[in-house]
């Protein structure tokens, strides 16, 4: 999985079950066993954990480290996924699923996104489909969405690969879960990219920050 810094601690705590003690100890600047990551901010760091699913099976989750440069992690996630497919799972595309979480402005504005999508179906780079989750808060830092792109939707970049795009109201939790289930089923059956555009809002105090 790859994502930017916003919401990262939430994902680490509630999806990856990284303990609050581990998270808050990083605020204290505690020393790491590996000095290569010393001094990096806590919402740049990666994490790996094994989670038990409702059916009793276990799944290994990995969140890749990511700098403040939005979308820079995208090709890294794809590369890790392809390497695991080739070297660990004997080319089985169903064994591992790359998930990328985007912001609406970064998805439309960062060139690396288009580059990664263009490689999605190439023999030397394909990973059996990526699940793109787009958190659309309708603003890119201080840029209104009207001034952020020429296309109607930020997910129009997915038209390059004729990928399906599911639009869902981010305030409707049940609908979001249902959409995610459909997206995963599509990916596992057709091994193609799929996009989920979750429309949310951002509060005024947060926007000013």
Model regions: which residues?
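C-terminal catalytic or substrate-handling cores of phosphate/nucleotide-
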Residues: 77, 180-186
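Conserved thiamine diphosphate
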Residues: 54-55, 60, 153-179
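Conserved internal helical-beta-strand scaffold that buttresses enzyme catalytic cores
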Residues: 1-112, 117-131, 136, 140-146, ...
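Hydrophobic/aromatic ligand-binding patch that stacks against planar heteroaromatic rings
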Residues: 122, 157, 186
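Single conserved hydrophobic/aromatic residue that forms the stacking wall/gate
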Residues: 200-209
């Amino acid at each position: 999985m790859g994502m930017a810094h916003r919401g990262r601690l939430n994902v680490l705590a509630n999806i990856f079950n990284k303990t609050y003690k581990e998270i808050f100890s990083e605020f204290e600047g505690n020393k790491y066993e590996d000095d290569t990551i010393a001094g990096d901010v806590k919402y740049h760091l990666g994490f790996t954990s094994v989670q038990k699913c409702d059916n009793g099976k276990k799944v290994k989750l990995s969140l890749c480290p990511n700098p403040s440069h939005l979308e820079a992690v995208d090709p890294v996630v794809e590369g890790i996924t392809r390497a695991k497919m080739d070297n660990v799972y004997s080319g089985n595309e169903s064994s591992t699923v790359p998930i990328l979480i985007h912001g609406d402005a970064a998805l439309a504005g960062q060139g690396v996104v288009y580059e990664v999508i263009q490689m999605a179906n190439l023999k030397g780079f394909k990973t059996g489909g990526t699940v793109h989750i787009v958190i659309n808060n309708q603003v890119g830092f201080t840029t209104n969405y009207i001034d952020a792109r020429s296309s109607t939707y930020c997910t129009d970049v997915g038209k390059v690969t004729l990928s399906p795009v599911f639009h869902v109201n981010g305030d409707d939790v049940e609908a979001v879960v249902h959409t995610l289930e459909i997206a995963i089923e599509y990916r596992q059956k057709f091994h193609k990219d799929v996009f989920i555009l979750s429309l949310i809002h951002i509060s005024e105090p947060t926007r000013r920050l």
